[in-house]
Amino acid sequence: MKLYQKFPETQVITTKGPLDFYRDVFEKGKWLFLFAHPADFTPVCTTEFVGFSKVYEEFKRLNVELVGMSVDSIYSHIEWLKDIQERYGIQVPFPLIADPDKRLARLLDIIDEASGVTIRAVFLVNPEGIIRFMAYYPIEYGRKIEELLRITKAALVNYKAKVSLPVDWEPGQEVIVPAPSTIDEAQIRMKLPNAKTWYLTFKKYDELPQDQRVV
């Protein structure tokens, strides 16, 4: 899969039961945050599941469906999640996809052919089923969840307000309005107080309508 492509229309089995991405997520107006991990009962993946569990409510508040996946069996998933609960006191609240036949992993092109496991991948998909962000991480590195939340919030503001976000943007900071497409618009833009030049104009975050902001 590539950025801006349509997410596959498919059904999967998870630790919370069957999941149809379009019927259960996109058609309900939700975003999808899908993250793949290489294998159950591995050290880095365990720390990630503890971390993602702690921010589950934050994703839920943003109307984003958080879902994990790997090519392990559903029974391996269940046993691993039980182990996490026993050792860390955390009940993983989001569904974990079992993909032992690697069908979804191959559709997403996230199989490491040498080891046969899923790579450490992330997909953020909007309610139209379009991939708006994707990233791959080495097997030895854990993801920075705080940064993934920031990217998710940026994607939501971009989607709702049709604005861009500058370097190191955080919710509450200025956004960038689209560049003008005609010379007349460019000349008008240069007269605005927040215009750095004709193609770069900022807008205060609190000037966006309330329903276009995230916090």
Swiss-Prot record:
<dbReference type="GO" id="GO:0045454">
    <property type="term" value="P:cell redox homeostasis"/>
</dbReference>
<keyword id="KW-0963">Cytoplasm</keyword>
<feature type="active site" description="Cysteine sulfenic acid (-SOH) intermediate">
    <location>
        <position position="45"/>
    </location>
</feature>
<feature type="domain" description="Thioredoxin">
    <location>
        <begin position="1"/>
        <end position="157"/>
    </location>
</feature>
<keyword id="KW-0049">Antioxidant</keyword>
<feature type="binding site">
    <location>
        <position position="120"/>
    </location>
    <ligand>
        <name>substrate</name>
    </ligand>
</feature>
<dbReference type="Pfam" id="PF00578">
    <property type="entry name" value="AhpC-TSA"/>
</dbReference>
<protein>
    <recommendedName>
        <fullName>Peroxiredoxin 1</fullName>
        <ecNumber>1.11.1.24</ecNumber>
    </recommendedName>
</protein>
<dbReference type="GO" id="GO:0033554">
    <property type="term" value="P:cellular response to stress"/>
</dbReference>
<keyword id="KW-0575">Peroxidase</keyword>
<comment type="subunit">
    <text>Homodecamer. Pentamer of dimers that assemble into a ring structure.</text>
</comment>
<dbReference type="GO" id="GO:0042744">
    <property type="term" value="P:hydrogen peroxide catabolic process"/>
</dbReference>
<dbReference type="GO" id="GO:0008379">
    <property type="term" value="F:thioredoxin peroxidase activity"/>
</dbReference>
<comment type="function">
    <text>Thiol-specific peroxidase that catalyzes the reduction of hydrogen peroxide and organic hydroperoxides to water and alcohols, respectively. Plays a role in cell protection against oxidative stress by detoxifying peroxides.</text>
</comment>
<keyword id="KW-0676">Redox-active center</keyword>
<dbReference type="InterPro" id="IPR000866">
    <property type="entry name" value="AhpC/TSA"/>
</dbReference>
<dbReference type="GO" id="GO:0006979">
    <property type="term" value="P:response to oxidative stress"/>
</dbReference>
<dbReference type="InterPro" id="IPR024706">
    <property type="entry name" value="Peroxiredoxin_AhpC-typ"/>
</dbReference>
<comment type="similarity">
    <text>Belongs to the peroxiredoxin family. Prx6 subfamily.</text>
</comment>
<keyword id="KW-0560">Oxidoreductase</keyword>
<dbReference type="GO" id="GO:0005829">
    <property type="term" value="C:cytosol"/>
</dbReference>
<dbReference type="InterPro" id="IPR036249">
    <property type="entry name" value="Thioredoxin-like_sf"/>
</dbReference>
<dbReference type="InterPro" id="IPR013766">
    <property type="entry name" value="Thioredoxin_domain"/>
</dbReference>
<dbReference type="InterPro" id="IPR022915">
    <property type="entry name" value="Peroxiredoxin_TDXH"/>
</dbReference>
<dbReference type="InterPro" id="IPR050217">
    <property type="entry name" value="Peroxiredoxin"/>
</dbReference>
<dbReference type="Pfam" id="PF10417">
    <property type="entry name" value="1-cysPrx_C"/>
</dbReference>
<dbReference type="InterPro" id="IPR019479">
    <property type="entry name" value="Peroxiredoxin_C"/>
</dbReference>
